[in-house]
Amino acid sequence: ADVQLWALGTMVPEAHALADKLAAETGLSVGVVNARFAKPIDATLLVEQARSAKLIVTLEDGAVTGGFGTGALETLAGHGVRTPIVRLGWPDRFVGHATDVKTLRAAHGLSPDQMLATVKAALK
């Protein structure tokens, strides 16, 4: 696929929705991997996909710093793969409270439309 989405946990359904929107709006092929767990990462599959993809996107319901996306970056760097990565997740700072997760995600760039815009910008 042109773009590979690697999602963890509660972000898997979000990744499928993002893949559908991204493919419809860009005409690119978009794949989704349910990573199931952060460690150990499936390095063989990640490296294989990254070598043929234009972009890798990780989606996690946790801090991106030191999280699943960082593990993906380290894995690719260790294999000499330079495919760009977009890490979608929570910022490395205190995240306030909200009445619902949709509001909280929107406040931190993680609404469906915001994630789509972030990925599309990375493809330019």
PLM ranges: what are they?
Residues A1-K124:
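Thiamine diphosphate
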